[in-house]
């Protein structure tokens, strides 16, 4: 879909495509990804492990002899890896990602403030004022959110802050942290 969307109907050239995949996929799954990418219109397809791609994106010197831990929180899973000398030394993953964080925020706001918000608002809170650590009053960020009052059913606006997000996602973040410690 993405290749067709990018190139349109007129194909002057076929692109070479780099596909990021989880570090732990099998060789059969790797072949399937390459074949599907070529079938979608790519001239060639290359595989890069997601933690390596994340490390490159974060300007981590992956070729050095020093070990670097990368935690890549995706939509559905979080992948942790130790990278050294350009490769993955050790990796693991857990089925906790951004989507679960959004749902945790949504539930927290509903339970604590009796305000029903949507997933888009929860994600916006995570992106704009989110923090994995509790912040002091001088450091925390705030934003206004709109939702539906859980009692009256009427629209309501309220201000939330970084510590609301931290409290909401603390359980999920603990799961990610405990998994990372296993490497």
Please annotate each region the language model reported:
Residues 1-73, 81-183:
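Nucleotide/phosphate-binding catalytic cleft detector across ATP-hydrolyzing
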Residues 76:
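Conserved Rossmann-like nucleotide-cofactor binding loop
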């Amino acid at each position: 879909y993405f290749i067709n969307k990018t190139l349109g109907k007129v194909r002057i050239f076929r692109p070479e495509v780099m596909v990021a995949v989880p570090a732990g996929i099998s060789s059969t799954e790797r072949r399937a990804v390459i074949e599907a990418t070529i079938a979608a219109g790519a001239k060639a397809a290359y595989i890069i492990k997601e933690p390596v791609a994340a490390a490159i994106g974060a300007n981590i010197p992956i070729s050095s002899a020093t070990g670097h831990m990368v935690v890549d929180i995706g939509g559905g899973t979080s992948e942790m890896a130790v990278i050294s000398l350009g490769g993955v030394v050790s990796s693991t993953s857990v089925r906790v990602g951004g989507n679960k964080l959004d749902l945790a925020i949504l539930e927290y706001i509903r339970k604590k403030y009796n305000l029903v918000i949507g997933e888009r608002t929860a994600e916006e809170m995570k992106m704009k004022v989110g923090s994995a650590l509790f912040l002091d009053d001088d450091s925390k960020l705030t934003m206004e959110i709109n939702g539906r009052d859980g009692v009256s059913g009427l629209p309501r606006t309220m201000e939330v802050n970084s510590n609301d997000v931290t409290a909401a996602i603390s359980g999920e973040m603990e799961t990610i942290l405990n998994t990372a410690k296993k490497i």
